């Protein structure tokens, strides 16, 4: 009995070890590390020098203003992209009102007549608010 428990404990330990080991990132070998260092030093010589320029207060204010203008224009474009909905039919049922089958269609084009309790209680509901 103790031998089987010992074997099961060993098996569980190995399974845990292999599970953790399989999820760890693979480490680079020394040979790969040397080749990476030599490649990175050669590649760094290929790039041109970069100069860092400090911004003054006026340029910061201008960039903020430009960013605000861009944000406003993008909001306006997003609001303009909405497609105009067709006008509702003249005899129509408002949202959340009763719309039993002989009743006319729902006023909201995104709403549909949804019936519950075996068709005894029907109401106009908007199923997709992003319609």
Swiss-Prot record:
Main localization, broad class: secreted
Keywords: Disulfide bond, Glycoprotein, Knottin, Secreted, Signal
Listed InterPro entries: Agouti, Agouti_dom, Agouti_dom_sf
GO cellular component: extracellular space
Comp. bias regions, Basic residues: 70-84
Signal peptide per UniProt: 1-22
Intracellular or extracellular location(s): Secreted
GO biological process terms on file: adult feeding behavior; epigenetic programming in the zygotic pronuclei; epigenetic regulation of gene expression; generation of precursor metabolites and energy; hormone-mediated signaling pathway; melanin biosynthetic process; melanosome organization; melanosome transport
Transmembrane residue ranges: none
Entry superkingdom: Eukaryota
Glycosylation sites: 39
GO molecular function, one term: type 4 melanocortin receptor binding
Bridged cysteine pairs (disulfide): 92-107, 99-113, 106-124, 110-131, 115-122
Residue ranges constituting the Agouti domain according to the UniProt record: 92-131
Keyword Ubl conjugation tagged: no
Organ and tissue specificity: Epithelial cells of the hair follicles and the epidermis.
Region span, Disordered: 58-100
Cited PROSITE patterns: AGOUTI_1, AGOUTI_2
Biological role: Involved in the regulation of melanogenesis. The binding of ASP to MC1R precludes alpha-MSH initiated signaling and thus blocks production of cAMP, leading to a down-regulation of eumelanogenesis (brown/black pigment) and thus increasing synthesis of pheomelanin (yellow/red pigment). Causes hair follicle melanocytes to synthesize phaeomelanin instead of black or brown pigment eumelanin and produces hairs with a subapical yellow band on an otherwise black or brown background when expressed during the mid-portion of hair growth.
Domain characteristics, as noted in the entry: The presence of a 'disulfide through disulfide knot' structurally defines this protein as a knottin.
Protein name: Agouti-signaling protein
Source species of the chain: Mus musculus (Mouse)
Lineage of the species this protein comes from: Eukaryota, Metazoa, Chordata, Craniata, Vertebrata
